[in-house]
Amino acid sequence: MADNGTITVEELKQLLEQWNLVIGFLFLAWIMLLQFAYSNRNRFLYIIKLVFLWLLWPVTLACFVLAAVYRINWVTGGIAIAMACIVGLMWLSYFVASFRLFARTRSMWSFNPETNILLNVPLRGTIVTRPLMESELVIGAVIIRGHLRMAGHSLGRCDIKDLPKEITVATSRTLSYYKLGASQRVGTDSGFAAYNRYRIGNYKLNTDHAGSNDNIALLVQ
């Protein structure tokens, strides 16, 4: 190490040579998360990515707070304070939106840091909830050998005649209704259908399916 406390080029090369393997594994893990960690592909990697995203918020906030406390000068200190306030407000807005979505759907997917759009499909007396990246005007349903898929998500076994008449897509501010449109059976246990959006408003999902009516949402008061 140099007299002024900095490291030399040779010392930097030695550090890189010693940590090359670890750095390679870290980059490989990052590539796997970016390329394969999707909710409709690999649920295990997707959960790891969500945990990583959750941890990034407090770690980033702590970095800016420490940069403000142990500032190099007043300029960097001011920038650190401003960035800490911005990150804190962004983190707070995430929690506000997540709790509003949870109040609407009662699903733990509401705290997904990647998206605040949830697909809700009533099947066999329960509501199956999965995350969506965007809200579409039309949502397709495909049944392949008795297994239902919507928006790339596998939702379980279902026959074409047992498809729900209505599904919903929830955000922190709205609940959109989709009604079953055209459907077509293909073979004995396959088929496809389309759901068209016909209503949108400030509703919350009714998770009580004890009744037999098809209206699965109540207006938020």
From Swiss-Prot:
UniProt entry tagged with the keyword Membrane: yes
Any GO MF annotation of the entry: identical protein binding
Membrane topology: Multi-pass membrane protein
Glycosylation site residues: 4
Signal peptide limits: none
Virion surface face of the membrane: 1-18, 71-78
Keywords: Glycoprotein, Host Golgi apparatus, Host membrane, Host-virus interaction, Membrane, Transmembrane, Transmembrane helix, Viral envelope protein, Viral immunoevasion, Viral matrix protein, Virion
Keyword Electron transport: no
GO cellular component: host cell Golgi membrane; plasma membrane; viral envelope; virion membrane
Subcellular location: Virion membrane; Host Golgi apparatus membrane
Transmembrane annotation, as ranges: 19-39, 50-70, 79-99
Intravirion topological intervals: 40-49, 100-221
Free-text description of this protein's post-translational modifications in UniProt: Glycosylated at N-terminus.
Principal location: virion
InterPro entries xref list: M_CoV (IPR002574), M_SARS-like-CoV (IPR044361)
Entry-linked CDD domains: SARS-like-CoV_M (cd21569)
The protein's assembly and partners: Homomultimer. Interacts with envelope E protein in the budding compartment of the host cell, which is located between endoplasmic reticulum and the Golgi complex. Forms a complex with HE and S proteins. Interacts with nucleocapsid N protein. This interaction probably participates in RNA packaging into the virus. Interacts with the accessory proteins 3a and 7a.
Function as written in the Swiss-Prot or TrEMBL entry: Component of the viral envelope that plays a central role in virus morphogenesis and assembly via its interactions with other viral proteins.
Similarity-based family: Belongs to the betacoronaviruses M protein family.
Protein name as it appears in the record: Membrane protein
Record gene name: M
